[in-house]
Amino acid sequence: WIMGHMVNAIAQIDEFVNLGANSIETDVSFDSSANPEYTYHGIPCDCGRTCTKWEHFNEFLKGLRKATTPGDSKYHEKLVLVVFDLKTGSLYDNQASDAGKKLAKSLLQNYWNNGNNGGRAYIVLSIPNLAHYKLITGFKEALTSEGHPELMDKVGYDFSGNDDIGDVANAYKKAGVTGHAWQSDGITNCSLRGLDRVRKAVANRDSSNGYINKVYYWTVDKRQSTRDALDAGVDGIMTNYPDVIADVLNESAYKAKFRIASYDDNPWETFKN
């Protein structure tokens, strides 16, 4: 999965997919009542990027729905996965469940079209704080009470705080999650970070009793760091330059071993090295 980083304006969906992304990451900010409000990152952000592009969350979802609904004039067949980077840092811990419920209702209405031929992309809910695990249970409760528990098949999870892998496993246990687990590791492109924790995550994925299904690394903009991440065995790379990742995947060393994921590749299934 080539994951376009910080895609917060509808116009950027086309831009990143046309550069080679089959997945995008979108920031979601919340208001003080735990409603998802804007697709917005804010300052500071990655070096070389504009930090302030934004849409109202529900409007972004409608644009995203068009981009992922077969037959729509804006449809991109290769856009198959969306990571919502949930900026829950503005919320109190006890608002996490509410945030999950409100997020689910927004998605149901504006992305899944109330279960009637909505967008088809798989969705990853990426949560920065292990203490906010109830966002997952709230999300699930809302979809169930709205009569669409089947949509949970399209939803996966990520805790993005670079926490100890054992602590992440524990948070999933509390949330009642088994499966659909993506594990991110990384740092802003302005800094360097080693691959030690990525290797631990890959080892967990490849073990018989690990909780991780997929591992992705962020934010990778250079050819050499792309090669290093691929050599470590990641499933996804988040980037500001999807064309760089696509170029490296075309190199003879990687062409035989990796390919770009399509809609038929189940993002919740573990593919072991």
Swiss-Prot record:
EC category = lyase
What's the protein called, per UniProt? Dermonecrotic toxin LapSicTox-alphaIB1bi
UniProt keyword annotation of Transmembrane helix present: no
Any one Gene Ontology cellular component term annotated for this protein: extracellular region
Give a short account of what the protein does. Answer: Dermonecrotic toxins cleave the phosphodiester linkage between the phosphate and headgroup of certain phospholipids (sphingolipid and lysolipid substrates), forming an alcohol (often choline) and a cyclic phosphate. This toxin acts on sphingomyelin (SM). It may also act on ceramide phosphoethanolamine (CPE), lysophosphatidylcholine (LPC) and lysophosphatidylethanolamine (LPE), but not on lysophosphatidylserine (LPS), and lysophosphatidylglycerol (LPG). It acts by transphosphatidylation, releasing exclusively cyclic phosphate products as second products.
Keywords in UniProt for this one? Cytolysis, Dermonecrotic toxin, Disulfide bond, Glycoprotein, Hemolysis, Lipid degradation, Lipid metabolism, Lyase, Magnesium, Metal-binding, Secreted, Toxin
State the active site.
5, 41 (nucleophile)
